[in-house]
Amino acid sequence: MTGEKSTIETTIAHYKVSKKVLSESSPVWDASLRGHFRESRSSTVPVYFGTLKSLELWFRIVHNVMVDEMHDLQVVDVYEAIEVCGNREWDISKLSKSSWAREWMNRQKYRELDLNAMSRLIYIAKELDFPREFMYMTQKLVYGTADHIKDRNPTKHQHLHLDHTIIRKLAHYSYSDQFLMYSADALNGAKGNLRCKILKGLFTPVGVFLQQSCECKKDSLFEYCKGLSHTGIWPLESHMKNSAQEILDTFDEFECDKPENACYKCLFRLSDSSIERTGNQVQEHFDGLCLDCMSVSKPKDGKDVDAAYWQHDTLKQYSRGCRVQHDQPTWYWSFMGRRTQMQAQQVARQR
């Protein structure tokens, strides 16, 4: 016994490839196959990275010999393919712009996925540049997640994740008149903002009742609070731990009796339509994140945010030039620049 550890190599697959095609597909392959490495003088090149399917996917893409079974790859293998992309310095656009990518995403049936599955797919949707799918899934995660929103990488390559400006491990919220200030990541900030809007919509009428001069306001306020209790909003501290969507879904339970002496102002605020209006406004508030707004607002090479991003706000055309239609909240939360820049823009906008 020498005390030295021994290793046994086992070949688990063979791929027949063109050395010329591989060399032309990436500088790393070119250096290893045409340079002074041992592989350049051999007809067999050992590969120690990736998975069987992730490597096969790349080899088929660069050789342009796709087969249908590649469109049914597991999410984990696509993560591995993205990792291989960095390892071999393959241009990821070869993957994202391929016909394979579109068909693979179509087969994911992303609209039918649960939130956990969406949290595994959003990173791929961003890396492979699927704006509609990314927007839809980020919207669903913001409305449907009760706890901190995370992207879930199912592989050991945990460096493959969304940028911290999109999802951060920890978020700290501070409320301003119109928005949660940009102290949280985009998705969790948008989620917190929805909850603030729900609270504001539900409890603003309480302050209005108190300011009225009518004699019926006391009885009307009591009935309004009873109506809110039917939705399960109380106890508030436990109910607000639910997702925004779970809270909004309880609005259908709002119902209150009308005091016999109630004036028309009180009757209006006691009507189902007041709660329904709040529910509709919050439900339609956030469209999800926009990849195009994210791209144009992310500073490049130390430069400031592209002027085209701020122009959206100036012109009130928030999805101008974007591949998906959206409103102002999506534009705001898709901002990838420095927080101080957005804060300064919001202050200037309110002058």
Show where each model-derived region lies.
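Canonical BTB/POZ domain core
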Residues: 2-110, 203-252
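Acidic, serine/threonine- and proline-rich low-complexity regulatory tracts
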Residues: 98-101, 105-351
